């Protein structure tokens, strides 16, 4: 494997499982110094061991702005600068309209939108010309999904953030892109609020039926898209929503 990121500092917000873990592992294998964050100390420790290569794990809740500030204050001291920021933290929750509470709305948007915004804001002093930012979106921002209104709204907002960030930061030489996964084999499927465990297999089969490739994507496939967007090969790409969705929304622009 090549070393496209040799000597680079990479921070993965939400790097303790799924797509974030796969991306962090791939960055480390390509020579980067990697920092991952997450909320669970146990999961973080396990992830850091899997990643290896001196990966640093820091407990930080992206849903709490003060913790985001503390994280980047620490990274300012310990790293000095960041070459790649991958903001992957997010939650999925699906409820019928009539059952959504204000707390549901605030929790989902607090992580998927507010947390993403302030992660980028707090990271900016550590980013400079040539840096890359990737945000994890979702095809839910483009495709109407029953019971998915709150989640989809948060991801549509994130997609807009990505475009605005790209427009605002292009003059500083910082690229910003969004990777939008389709149905992917990650732990978030099993943790999705509102779905009992016995319903997961049927939901998974429905996802496969609705995917033109007739299979779920893998975290490694999405991670490969993330690494491409952060690499020199993508140096002319900014403000783009790259879909890694198995063709689910190929007819939607």
PLM features per residue range, with description:
Residues 97-98, 130, 143-149, 171-172, ...:
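Active-site loop immediately N-terminal to the catalytic Tyr-X3-Lys motif
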Residues 125-126, 167-171, 235:
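Alpha-helical segment proximal to the catalytic Tyr-Lys
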Residues 143, 227, 238-253:
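Short C-terminal tail/terminal secondary-structure segment
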Residues 138:
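Residue(s) in the substrate-gating loop at a strand-loop-helix junction
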Residues 16-18:
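Conserved glycine-rich cofactor-binding loop
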Residues 120, 154, 162:
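Active-site helix of classical SDR
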Residues 96-97, 101-107, 207:
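Substrate-binding pocket helix/loop in short-chain dehydrogenase/reductase
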């Amino acid at each position: 494997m090549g070393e496209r990121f040799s000597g680079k500092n990479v921070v993965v917000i939400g790097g303790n499982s799924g797509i974030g873990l796969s991306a962090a592992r791939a960055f480390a294998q390509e020579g980067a110094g990697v920092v991952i964050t997450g909320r669970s100390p146990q999961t973080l420790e396990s992830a850091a061991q899997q990643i290896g290569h001196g990966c640093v794990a820091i407990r930080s809740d992206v849903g709490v702005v003060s913790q985001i500030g503390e994280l980047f204050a620490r990274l300012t001291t310990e790293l000095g600068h960041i070459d790649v920021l991958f903001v992957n933290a997010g939650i999925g929750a699906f409820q019928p309209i009539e059952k959504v509470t204000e707390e549901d709305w605030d929790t989902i948007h607090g992580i998927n939108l507010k947390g993403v915004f302030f992660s980028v804001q707090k990271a900016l002093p550590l980013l400079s010309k040539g840096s890359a930012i990737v945000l994890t979106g979702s095809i839910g921002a483009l495709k109407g999904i029953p019971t998915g209104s709150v989640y989809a709204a948060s991801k549509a907002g994130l997609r807009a953030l990505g475009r605005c960030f790209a427009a605002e930061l292009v003059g500083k030489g910082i690229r910003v892109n969004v990777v939008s996964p389709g149905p992917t084999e990650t732990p978030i499927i099993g943790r999705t609020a509102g779905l009992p465990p016995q319903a997961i297999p049927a939901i998974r089969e429905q996802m496969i039926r609705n995917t033109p490739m007739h299979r779920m994507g893998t975290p490694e496939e999405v991670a490969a898209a993330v690494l491409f967007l952060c690499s020199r090969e993508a140096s002319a790409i900014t403000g783009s929503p790259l879909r890694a969705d198995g063709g689910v929304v190929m007819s939607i622009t």
